[in-house]
C-alpha cells in the first residue's frame, strides 16, 4: 500500500469514527477525544486504542463493537483490533473545540 493510499484509508477511518456516539453524549467519540491511536499496517491490519469518559461506561461493549464493525467496513482495512486503554486518563481537554462548545464547556 502506498503512503497516499494509507492516508486516504486513514481519513476514511476518521470519517467513520465520527459516526460512532456514546448514547448518553451528543458528540461523536472522535471529537470527544476518545480515540488515542489509529495505526494502519501496510497489509490493512488496523489497531485502534480508545478510552471512555469513565471506566465504568455502561455502553462500553456496544461502542467498541460499533467501532470495530464500522472500521472493518472501510475498503482497505483487512482486520481491526480495538484496544480499550485508560492511560492517559481522559479529561475534557482532549475534546475538540467544537465538542466543548456543543457540551457547554466553552
Functional labels for PLM-detected ranges:
Residues 1-106:
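Domain-level signature for proteins that mediate thiol-based redox and metal-cofactor handling
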